[in-house]
Swiss-Prot record:
Reaction equations catalysed: taurine + pyruvate = sulfoacetaldehyde + L-alanine
Pathways per UniProt: Organosulfur degradation; taurine degradation via aerobic pathway; acetyl phosphate and sulfite from taurine: step 1/2
Class of enzymatic activity (EC top level): transferase
General function of this protein: Catalyzes the degradation of taurine into alanine and sulfoacetaldehyde.
Name of the gene this protein is made from: tpa
Induction: Induced by taurine via TauR.
Name the UniProt record assigns to this protein: Taurine--pyruvate aminotransferase
Enzyme Commission numbers on file: 2.6.1.77
Length: 459
């Protein structure tokens, strides 16, 4: 049994955290009378906090990131060796791991050819927005500058990224936002907006309706998550992606797929969009790229887009005038290369697909026993269970009760997630995203823990 190196006296560490650290997405008032959780070590899918408590992590680091699990010495050693050789040079020049990772990544993404490095998913998405706007000014006379985004999707935390937030609570109080960002309807059939057959095609038609309302010549790009993450783990219905792709080609609209959560194996394929046979113009990724072992994000595009920034080399405003300081840090691509190798050599895409089927089957079994589960959805190790107060009416379960289920699981030693501060009244989906290394026993323990929590909720 692994013994975590728990500090002899955790009190000073916890006190320092309480006194000086501002935690993400957290209300700190409770920490005036209770301790914040401070983690000290992880191994595989297990975590230990500063008090010595052990947890099974079904969230991959809380936000779909630690896809390889904790304590991978091979990744750490690859990063350490690269940092000794060359830790950094600005992205205006190249580095060995930057070149090698771009080549390896593009080999997984037929039809795409160029990789632009930055640090976070928010940045990666903003790079696309800037590219689209520059293309608008230089090639369309200022037209085709609008960017469409979908309800319930999330694309980052900067002001421009929040302008494309389909999650009202994430954007509230942070406006006013820049102009030129327009929402399209979501595609969650469980909470259908139309009574029809072929719901996926109807949801795609709704995008075309927005395009025609705004004017096709005004729209340059459509940004979508292949599977919506924090908005409820939404897998688009059959027929959706094929029609969306057709609509974008019909109106000469660039298709930007935000793979920050889905990318690098989370769904059982290298990228979520590859389940649907579509060809994007931009793909952005971050979390799973280096599996949390280094900060890196990528904006990947086609040679056709790349060429638009080379057409007038004598013009000092022709090229993409953007830089991301730590996009030049070599730890990111070094960790990403090793992550790619591990996924391939350890068969983690196959494991993710198989364990994802088991996780979905277990959740559907729970739904047979717990009426509070209204819908189960997901792909690979990217799953959700929406909780309801009434299955017939689909009335959402009170959000406090959803959080009580999450807390109960943590008390049992399993960390799960739930949609939160996203959609008013609909932050009711349990989110499960164990590492791609998950075993059958770990999958079963996760769902057994949820089962026990739901039984207590019913009682």
């Amino acid at each position: 049994m692994h013994a975590a190196p728990i500090p002899q006296d955790a009190a000073p560490i916890i006190a320092a955290d309480r006194a000086h650290v501002w935690h993400h997405l957290s209300q700190h008032k409770p920490y005036e009378t209770s301790d914040p959780r401070v983690f000290v070590e992880g191994r595989g899918m297990r975590l230990w906090d500063a008090t010595g408590r052990e947890f099974l992590d079904a969230t991959s680091g809380g936000v779909w990131t630690v896809n390889l699990g904790y304590g991978r010495k091979d990744v750490v050693e690859a990063v350490a060796a690269q940092l000794l050789a060359l830790p950094y040079y600005a992205g205006a020049a190249g580095t060995v791991p930057g070149a090698r990772y771009a080549e390896a990544l593009i080999a997984k993404m037929p039809g795409l050819s160029r990789v632009y490095y930055s640090n976070s998913g928010s940045e990666a998405n903003e790079k696309v927005y800037k590219m689209v706007r520059q293309i608008s000014h230089r090639h369309h006379g200022g037209r085709k500058g609008k960017i469409l985004f979908r309800e319930r999707d999330y694309h980052g935390t900067t002001i421009a990224a929040l302008a494309t937030s389909g999650q009202a609570q994430r954007a509230e109080h942070y406006g006013p936002f820049p102009d030129g960002f327009v929402s399209v309807p979501h595609c969650l059939e469980y909470r259908a907006q139309w009574d029809c057959a072929n719901y996926g095609e109807r949801a795609a038609d709704a995008i075309e309706e927005v395009i025609l309302r705004e004017g096709p010549d005004s729209i340059g790009c459509l940004v979508l998550e292949p599977i919506t993450a924090g908005g409820g783990v939404i897998v688009p219905p059959a027929g959706y992606w094929e029609k969306v792709s057709h609509i974008c080609r019909k109106y000469n609209i660039l298709l930007h797929l935000d793979e920050v959560v889905c990318g690098l194996g989370r769904t059982g394929a290298w990228f979520g969009y590859q389940h649907y046979g579509i060809q994007p113009d931009f793909v952005t990724m971050a979390k799973g790229v280096a599996a949390g072992y280094a900060a890196i994000s990528c904006t990947v595009t086609t040679e056709a887009v790349f060429e638009l920034f080379k057409d007038a080399p004598s013009d000092p405003l022709c090229h993409f005038r953007d830089i991301s300081t730590f996009g030049g840090c070599t730890a990111g691509p070094a960790a990403a290369l090793e992550t790619l190798r591990i996924i391939e050599e350890e068969g983690l895409l196959q494991n993710t697909a198989q364990m994802g089927e088991r996780l979905l089957a277990n959740l559907r079994d729970l739904a047979e026993r717990h009426a509070v589960i209204g819908d189960v959805r997901g792909k690979g190790l990217f799953c959700g269970a929406e909780l309801v107060a009434d299955r017939r009416t689909k009335e959402p379960l009170a959000e406090a009760k959803v959080q009580a289920v999450v807390a109960d699981c943590a008390a049992q030693g399993v960390l799960i997630g739930a949609t939160n501060r996203s959609i008013p009244g609909l932050n009711t989906t349990l989110c499960l995203a164990p590492a791609l290394i998950a075993s059958e026993a770990e999958i079963d323990r996760i769902t057994e823990t949820i089962d026990a929590a739901l039984r207590r909720l019913a009682a």
